[in-house]
């Protein structure tokens, strides 16, 4: 099968980071395209994902570590974390050369010793987190609505971008795995199932050398999927697991498995936003549970597109997982981060895109339909009304991001209604 490279938003981030640092570390889940993206800008490569190369490199590390770093620059060190001492060698080499764009490192897990090592690279290394493809990157979004332009104050005339809900169900189950975007039908859907199987059978054992039960990892992923896009505690997840796991299970065990899955970049929870408010409501600080890609949730539950169409409540939560994936990628391209908001009065906002310059946008995520859209608009306007604009700016814009809709448009009250298949960074 011939595959052409589909440009990634990370291409721009990598180019920018290389221009100002001696080395750039690209992290993210396996199969998300880190190595392929790095190859577009590297001039030589050390492929430690190849067992033969790894064996020889381990021997060379004892004799002459510097030899592994020789080659045209930027030099790509793929799966660097398999030889953690390489980090110090690269850091020292960057100090010695005193030049930018020397090394690109990629890794799909964080080993304990590597985790400690990473902190020693301050100032020499930049970090980029890659995720599976957004719909814009995979070609399923036209990109006619730009978040950057909305932040710059641009309004939009009604733009046609019709989407079929069944197509969104398929894209949710397929996920943004680059290889899957070149495939179709059930063959494309298989990729997510293969990914989950690889994680529970191999990766969760190898990430830190701790022996874990594959079936328990499966049960945890299923419990996480049932609670995706919700602010639930570990104790709630444990209770859900116990209904499917007759073995003794404590909260520490649940936390250990979740920590391992976070190190593998499988799970990526959404932190709470903490704005200045005029109200006395207490802000809830619990994370919202999310996967790095919604297909992990659907595959863990054994769901396909038809299953989502027959259970719109679950579909809505898994679609929110997809929207969070895309918005996180877009946020990083805009020097921003994504958060969620919820307070003691029950007021909530699915996502808040907060940029480094202090500007932010409030974004609700809905499947679509007049009632759900109106509910989203009401929540956005209520949250905007309690933000203390004497201490922080008002939102740059508010948006309801939908799965379906014939048009992207701006309502008379200023709120944007945008189908996700129209959106880009």
Task: Enumerate the language-model features and the residues they cover.
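Domain-level recognition of nuclease-like catalytic cores that cleave nucleotide substrates
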Residues: 401-425
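N-terminal pre-Walker A segment at the start of P-loop NTPase domains
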Residues: 1-15
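Conserved lysine of the Walker
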Residues: 34-35
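Accessory nucleic acid-recognition modules appended to NTPase machines
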Residues: 181-359
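Short glycine-rich substrate-engagement loop in P-loop NTPases that contacts/grips substrate
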Residues: 45-74
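Interdomain motor-coupling "hinge/lid" segment immediately C-terminal to the ATP-binding subdomain
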Residues: 115-230
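Hydrophobic anchor at the beta1->P-loop junction of P-loop NTPases
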Residues: 26
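Conserved catalytic/switch belt of AAA+ P-loop NTPases
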Residues: 87-111, 119
